[in-house]
């Protein structure tokens, strides 16, 4: 691992030398070549065939019910493969088995990391399988966050994919900065999809801002490399949209979810493979997230999405739009249905099962705090729309709350109507805009209200529906 240590995850550079050396030593033990790889008598052709078979095997899904021993073996095999790719003397002269291979490897690598972390947390919390708990206790770094992040960052650094993407943005030749490794398809594609992998891992760990920051050098458009692989396309927009939702940028989240759902609906007749079929099963999750975002930020949706949303979550959406305590269980249900399977960045405490907090429950709690803050928003706005000026105490009487509590809520809500909206640069950047059609200002106890309604574009509506009728 020392050969590509500079590619390790950010924020770990300040660790003590002793701790770093321990991690390096532990990692080296875990990435030894499989038996026979160092045999000098093995022919070059036999070695090449063995590596090719390992490349193919790395992209194959692991059975969900695989025993713990198999999960450990899978981790060792991944470590061995990435060690060979990253630490060989010079770039490995191999071509990927297929165009989709690099994505499949990164996708499966992160899936197994996610699955193992969830399994380990479940064993620790249940405390009813002492044998497996002891094995997991003795191997805390197997499928650890440090190892997984280090592999992804190392693949990105070795391939110099960030430099290549930056050169492409400047309309320069990316091969001029690719180097010996980045000029080869194997490294370039692994490095590129490792960026998407980092987006996913940081989101699973709950660092949503860093997740968005990882895509600074990737342009979200149809020409991007990830858009050529349907599963990568779907995954990218799902995690970007979810990260936006968790940092309260609901307009941008709706934009991301809408893009991929419309794309899926328009291409379903052209793609008939197992990968596509598995993606379409996740559409309900995306619709559930859109329902949540629309409740926070009412907006017009594409007709296709609006129709699907009404069919799948019509009753729930109505409760969300009404607000109040009745909406809380609906928010919780939709969030559990559609959120990623969050993981903890550290191994669980097997000796104190009750001290382990379920990561999903933790993020649900954070999300529900935001929901409770906005719970009365629909009711308050329904009153404000009826007036141009209104006394604070009068509105407080309608809502049966104390005037000062209402004042605090109005100030917080007004602040949150100002949101960043992504335009063109980094995903965390954007223009500060008012995302609500209802605005108000407070002068002492007097509330001044203004409403800006955008007229419906009937011409566009007629054209869309006429094209559906006659096409």
Swiss-Prot record:
Alphabetical UniProt keywords: Cytoplasm, Initiation factor, Protein biosynthesis
Molecular-function GO term, any one: translation initiation factor activity
Domain PCI intervals: 252-446
Disulfide feature: none
Subcellular location field: Cytoplasm
A Pfam entry, by short name: Paf67
Entry annotated with the keyword Cytoplasm: yes
GO biological process, one term: formation of cytoplasmic translation initiation complex
GO cellular component terms attached to this protein's record: eukaryotic 43S preinitiation complex; eukaryotic 48S preinitiation complex; eukaryotic translation initiation factor 3 complex
Protein purpose: Component of the eukaryotic translation initiation factor 3 (eIF-3) complex, which is involved in protein synthesis of a specialized repertoire of mRNAs and, together with other initiation factors, stimulates binding of mRNA and methionyl-tRNAi to the 40S ribosome. The eIF-3 complex specifically targets and initiates translation of a subset of mRNAs involved in cell proliferation.
Annotated family: Belongs to the eIF-3 subunit L family.
Cross-referenced PANTHER family: EUKARYOTIC TRANSLATION INITIATION FACTOR 3, EUKARYOTIC TRANSLATION INITIATION FACTOR 3 SUBUNIT L
Cross-referenced HAMAP family: eIF3l
Full protein name: Eukaryotic translation initiation factor 3 subunit L
